[in-house]
Curated annotation (Swiss-Prot):
Keywords per UniProt: Disulfide bond, Fusion of virus membrane with host endosomal membrane, Fusion of virus membrane with host membrane, Glycoprotein, Hemagglutinin, Host cell membrane, Host membrane, Host-virus interaction, Hydrolase, Membrane, Signal, Transmembrane, Transmembrane helix, Viral attachment to host cell, Viral envelope protein, Viral penetration into host cytoplasm, Virion, Virus entry into host cell
Span list, region Fusion domain-1: 2-27
Domain of life of the source: Viruses
Intervals, Cytoplasmic compartment: 639-642
Active site feature: S58 (nucleophile), D353 (charge relay system), H356 (charge relay system)
Description of post-translational modifications: In natural infection, inactive HEF is matured into HEF1 and HEF2 outside the cell by one or more trypsin-like, arginine-specific endoprotease.
A GO CC term attached to the entry: viral envelope
Coiled coil: none
Name of the featured protein: Hemagglutinin-esterase-fusion glycoprotein
Organism: Influenza C virus (strain C/Pig/Beijing/439/1982)
Amino acid sequence: AEKIKICLQKQVNSSFSLHNGFGGNLYATEEKRMFELVKPKAGASVLNQSTWICFGDSRTDQSNSAFPRSADVSAKTAEKFRSLSGGSLMLSMFGPPGKVDYLYQGCGKHKVFYEGVNWSPHTAIDCYRKNWTDIKLNFQKSIYELASQSHCMSLVNALDKTIPLQATKGVAKNCNNSFLKNPALYTQEVKPLDQICGEENLAFFTLPTQFGTYECKLHLVASCYFIYDSKEVYNKRGCGNYFQVIYDSSGKVVGGLDNRVSPYTGNSGDTPTMQCDMLQLKPGRYSVRSSPRFLLMPERSYCFDMKEKGLVTAVQSIWGKGRKSDYAVDQACLSTPGCMLIQKQKPYIGEADDHHGDQEMRELLSGLDYEARCISQSGWVNETSPFTEEYLLPPKFGRCPLAAKEESIPKIPDGLLIPTSGTDTTVTKPKSRIFGIDDLIIGLFFVAIVEAGIGGYLLGSRKESGGGVTKESAEKGFEKIGNDIQILRSSTNIAIEKLNDRISHDEQAIRDLTLEIENARSEALLGELGIIRALLVGNISIGLQESLWELASEITNRAGDLAVEVSPGCWIIDNNICDQSCQNFIFKFNETAPVPTIPPLDTKIDLQSDPFYWGSSLGLAITTPISLAALVISGIAICRTK
């Protein structure tokens, strides 16, 4: 009788790279980084398509006769906008004669504002003020601030009021022989000579708790008054000083100007200038007292429900060639904590006309069609990687990547994976210790193809018991890592959240500190990923060793009395009793056996966070169960000895 020895061979060459892990090591033909660096896309996007709203003008107005050529957004995004050609939030607040008056209102956790150009130097609105840019800046800033704290907002275009009987609505030559809708100008008709100076005015207005279906917890009110250079300019008849003051229901002064206690400007001029301060007032009844002759009466407001903190994006709104713009929107957003500003890099060049349908702006706003994982001043990201090459400028919200160098990201094995020998006392021993970990004294198991034929055998753990790391223990390990990481980061997250509210007060110092914190977080995350990588490698290695044990057990079971196991992975067969077809059945599974499969290794890691926290992440979680790695066996190397 001729007896031969058939073994699973140990083979590996210099093309393999070694990967060390907790509980076991691997050789692999390939390797890949756990994550690739992502690059943010410039422009605006949103975290959730169902929770955002926009306010715009003709560039987002679907009813415009030139739509879609006039639009800077897609038709899908235009449906989200509350827009009317020629409109702006400030025009609706003040209501200059002859201008579009649109009822802006809507609800959303994330609010995008792309409007403002229709009140700019080009429109040349006067009404006792040649340059409205400062008022526009304060108005837009107040809108952004309150919008970031509210779910819903609405223009209130008719406040309840009580006006003195002797006062009637007045007009002004420098306001198209009309006047603003808000504030309204009321004047006294003075007849008796002894009353030539007139009487003081007392009026009342009420800020509602609700306007239509919109709840109002806070109102933005324009407190407007005149500024005179001197008392003589105000009243050449020698009457008293000018004043216009707003009081709340308790008699406290909340706005206005009183030249009885405040000096005049002292400049030379004979025409007053109207000033409007932006007040944030609670619902209630307010009184307005003014010096004789006339009264500026608040008749509109913007109301906010103040129900939740949200996101605000402001888009630069400028004219194209030949028209003068201001940059109040830009300045207002930059001076409002948490406001993200979208700015053009080139002049506005329209498609429909010089001022509508700019290609660069369309690209910057194209992200509004999608959901992003992170939005920031640097742009938006929808990839899952936790790392980016450059630091993302705040404000930023969502699951934002941290800055890292590519070479610092850990690598994991890929391709053909071979477990090494080693000892891990935490691993449950298989029932039969064929290819047990402690038995793998030298070399690596590598099953190579000797002769073509079979479809292959996919190795991996197909049992919930036996050797190797169990699914339950692996999941518990990853859960513990996630909890530890959250504890590690919690104090940092709280600190950064507080810094977000202070960013505008000491901007550079805060930004520098924030950058240091984010760098530390990036280094910590890289270290955490290194631990996870080592656990993955060990988990895969142990699982593959168990799979080899399963393969050896399968061979022994198939052989029965025809083959005698003489050492781990080696059998003696009588060639005269078990011919080639017999050996093929034992070792090649007769070339017809179905190929068992298991899920491939999934190393996807997801960084979870509060979607409106402007830092990065609050914790780390494995999004899907970790499967043991798969090793494809194309055949069995046969080492014959007589």
